[in-house]
Each structure stands twice: as C-alpha cells, then as structure tokens.
C-alpha cells in the first residue's frame, strides 16, 4: 500500500471519528436537556460513524496481515488517535447518560 492510499484511509478515519465525536457531544447536550430519545438517536448515528471508521482501519490491518508493505503516514496516526479518543468518549457517554437519567 503506497503512502497516498494510507493517507486516504487516515483521512477517512479522521472524518468518521470526528463525525462520531460530534454526534456523541450533541447527544450529551440533548441528555442534559432531558431529551433522551434524541440523545439515543444521536448515539446511534455516532455508532454508525465509528463502524465506518473501523471499516477503514480494518482494511488497512487486513492488508498488513496479508504481507503488504504499509507506508508510514502521520495522517493515519492522527486518524488512529481520533478514533481512540472517540471510542473513549463513547464509553464515557454510557455512564454520563445514566447520571442524567437518574436526575
């Protein structure tokens, strides 16, 4: 896989992880306002974005596992960082929503 291909996957991961992060933060705002149906819908949208980011990540991992030489890319590293922090936010959202639901 050449550098450009790896960078494109990195940009995909950044974009999807960024969209997921935005959805999760919107969900938190909705929960703060007591609109849990909206929060749940936004979390589902965020989860779909995470799934797309994972799809891009998995395609890269599969190519490496098949023996392809993967070019180093700061863009890909940046994408991985975005994905990791967004997944952490997703995990924390579960606990935060419980606090808001309890009142």
Swiss-Prot record:
This is PTS system lactose-specific EIIA component. Its main location: cytoplasm. The phosphoenolpyruvate-dependent sugar phosphotransferase system (sugar PTS), a major carbohydrate active transport system, catalyzes the phosphorylation of incoming sugar substrates concomitantly with their translocation across the cell membrane. The enzyme II LacEF PTS system is involved in lactose transport, but can also use galactose, isopropyl beta-thio-galactopyranoside and thiomethyl beta-D-galactopyranoside (TMG) as substrates. GO terms for molecular function: metal ion binding; transferase activity. Residues 4-102 form the PTS EIIA type-3 domain. One of its GO terms (biological process) is phosphoenolpyruvate-dependent sugar phosphotransferase system. InterPro entries: PTS_IIA_lac/cel, PTS_IIA_lac/cel_sf. Keywords: Cytoplasm, Magnesium, Metal-binding, Phosphoprotein, Phosphotransferase system, Sugar transport, Transferase, Transport. Changing residue 82 to S: Reduced activity. It is found in: Cytoplasm. Mg(2+) binds at residue 81. Binds 1 Mg(2+) ion per trimer. It holds the Pfam family PTS_IIA. Disulfide bonds: none annotated. Gene3D superfamilies: Phosphotransferase system, lactose/cellobiose-type IIA subunit (1.20.58.80). The PTS EIIA type-3 domain is phosphorylated by phospho-HPr on a histidyl residue. Then, it transfers the phosphoryl group to the PTS EIIB type-3 domain. The keyword NADP does not apply. Its cofactor is Mg(2+). The modification Phosphohistidine is found at residue 78. Induction: Induced by lactose, galactose and galactose-6-P. Repressed by glucose. Homotrimer. GO terms for cellular component: cytoplasm. It comes from the Bacteria. The active site is at 78 (tele-phosphohistidine intermediate).
